[in-house]
Amino acid sequence: MVGGEDFTHGNTLIFDAERDAFLYTPKFLDAIVAVGRQSGALNWQAGGRFGSFTDEDGDTIDPDRAYDVDGPNRTWWSHAHMSHAWADGFVLYDNGTHHSPLVSRVAAYTWDVEAATLKRTFEFVNESGIYDPILGDVRKLDGGNYLVAWTMSGSMTEITPAGEVVWRMSVELGSGVGRTGYVPTLYQVTYQ
């Protein structure tokens, strides 16, 4: 596509029951958009060139600089995958395609959708400086830790809110871990 972006390449689609909307992250727009389930209308956009949200410093992304994704406090993201959102926040896997140096990270945010503001509350970069140009995923676990799939390295980690790695897994095949989820047990245990 000459002079344009593939806006239909969606990395994520999540249903937000509280707002009766779908949250969609189009890869090349570097944004999160909310689309009304009933109306199909664009409710709002966070991030990207034309996003209406501001960060904690009041910064937005200049529409004339499409890839000014970091902002003064590295608030923004690039080519992210967001699999987990809740009423006042979300966590995403920031592929980091427009960061310098190229490095992927986990970033969690609080947001106020009505005020159109967001604040980064957590950031973690893998100690080996992994850059995943594709895929990657993160979920916030019930206890507050984050479960991360570092796709290209074929590894997963569980990270505390303090940034401590408490669990790690690697697969011999390399880039074989895409989306992640937590399964508490593979067995249903019943006692008589």
Residue positions per predicted region:
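Histidine-/acidic-rich catalytic cores in large beta-rich domains
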Residues: 1-192
